Amino acid sequence: YELEEDWFGPFTFENNKSKEVMWSVQSQYAKGTLFQWQFERYNHYNAKNYFDLSGYSSTNGMHLQPSLKPNGDPYTDKLGRPFAKFHAKDLRKKLYVYKGNGKYEGMFLYGKLQRISRSGTEVKCTGLYEYPGEVLEFVDQVAQFKKVKDGEYSSVNELPSNISTGEENSGIRLCKLPVPDNTDKTLAFNSDYPVLRFAEIYYMLAECKYRSGYKKEAANLFNEVRKRNFENEVDPDPVTETNIDKYRILDEWMVEFLGEQRRRTDLRRWGLYTTG
């Protein structure tokens, strides 16, 4: 096994051939064995229109933990805030767009979901509930902003933010596994779901090195994985002997394995599952 050169290597439509994926759950359009729950749960009901992919539905059921308060101020908790933890120059922190022939860029849906498709038509994700017919703008916040416009709250500073006060556009959406458009529809959900990646072995060894007092060696292992996430492998914020600690390590685990069902295990291992 070896690390892929590109960040998307372990997740492509042909990731069954990836040298980094050590164990995966098979998904194949032709055989009808589709692993599509991430698409169904992360995406808005009308996200299929933005993707320009017909025939699939989604439940608007999940999004990333917010990084910002309703008034736009950042949360200051050391843990969590996943979208904010991605560096601005991280190639993954782009709006997801399918480019054709199995190629794509970005790993998230955020901002206004409106673009010109490969066929030249305008595609967009429009609202159904709080913002019916409007092009939705997905925000890194959770609050019922419509109630400020309607006069129920005088300002965003008064808005509560919890699991019951979201709107249909609340939260950043994760596209860890790629989604094609109608032109390449037979690729839909052909990505196997990675259960274990070789990058995880790097991170396990890095954590062991850190716990044994070898901070520099630990940092180097994290950086071997990190560098592919930046243009020309120039990492603007590498892990170093001086900035590595348990919080930086947990951030590295979170960012690299976001959406891969590791977070609870990692927090429990460090005794931080019930803290901020």
Feature-to-residue mapping (PLM):
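Acidic/polar loop patches that form or flank catalytic/metal-binding clefts of enzymes
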Residues: 2-6, 233-236, 259-260
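Short, mixed-charge aromatic SLiMs
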Residues: 225-235
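Bilobed periplasmic-binding protein-like "clamshell/Venus-flytrap" ligand-binding domains
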Residues: 255-269
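Extended, hydrophobic/aromatic-rich amphipathic alpha-helical segments that build helical scaffolds
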Residues: 1, 14-16, 23, 90, ...
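Short, mixed-charge amphipathic alpha-helical segments
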Residues: 235-245
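Membrane-interface anchoring segments and C-terminal beta-barrel signals
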Residues: 231-232, 255-256, 276
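Elongated scaffold/linker segments in the mid-to-C-terminal portions of large proteins
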Residues: 2-198, 275-276
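An acidic- and aromatic-residue-enriched active-site/binding cleft used to recognize and process polar
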Residues: 8, 28, 230, 254, ...
